[in-house]
Amino acid sequence: MENLSVDLLYMAAALMMGLAAIGAAIGIGILGGKFLEGAARQPDLIPLLRTQFFIVMGLVDAIPMIAVGLGLYVMFAVA
């Protein structure tokens, strides 16, 4: 029975890391599309849009890093 709970913790950590990566990939894809759409509509605002794009992209990319840290914590510290 002990082995089953450890296996479930490993599966939970894998799901946490995988779903966070998939969500971030979808978010960055949508963000890139909106950036290109905004740049095509108003080319004179490209420097402002680029700055905001990279700030938000960094925030979106930080979520999977946090999830990987939590997943590794669950795998090695809790289990």
Swiss-Prot record:
Site features described as Reversibly protonated during proton transport, chain residue numbers: D61
Transmembrane segments: 11-31, 53-73
Superkingdom as given in the UniProt entry: Bacteria
Subcellular location: Cell inner membrane
Family matches, as InterPro entries: ATP_synth_csu_bac/chlpt, ATP_synth_F0_csu, ATP_synth_F0_csu_DDCD_BS, ATP_synth_F0_csu_sf, ATPase_proteolipid_c-like_dom, F/V-ATP_Csub_sf
GO cellular component entries: plasma membrane; proton-transporting ATP synthase complex; proton-transporting two-sector ATPase complex, proton-transporting domain
Membrane topology field: Multi-pass membrane protein
UniProt-recorded Gene Ontology molecular function terms: lipid binding; proton-transporting ATP synthase activity, rotational mechanism
Gene3D superfamilies: F1F0 ATP synthase subunit C (1.20.20.10)
A matching Pfam family: ATP-synt_C
Subunit structure: F-type ATPases have 2 components, F(1) - the catalytic core - and F(0) - the membrane proton channel. F(1) has five subunits: alpha(3), beta(3), gamma(1), delta(1), epsilon(1). F(0) has three main subunits: a(1), b(2) and c(10-14). The alpha and beta chains form an alternating ring which encloses part of the gamma chain. F(1) is attached to F(0) by a central stalk formed by the gamma and epsilon chains, while a peripheral stalk is formed by the delta and b chains.
Family indicated by similarity: Belongs to the ATPase C chain family.
HAMAP family for this protein: ATP_synth_c_bact (MF_01396)
Known function: F(1)F(0) ATP synthase produces ATP from ADP in the presence of a proton or sodium gradient. F-type ATPases consist of two structural domains, F(1) containing the extramembraneous catalytic core and F(0) containing the membrane proton channel, linked together by a central stalk and a peripheral stalk. During catalysis, ATP synthesis in the catalytic domain of F(1) is coupled via a rotary mechanism of the central stalk subunits to proton translocation.
Protein name per Swiss-Prot or TrEMBL: ATP synthase subunit c
Organism lineage string: Bacteria, Pseudomonadati, Pseudomonadota, Gammaproteobacteria, Enterobacterales
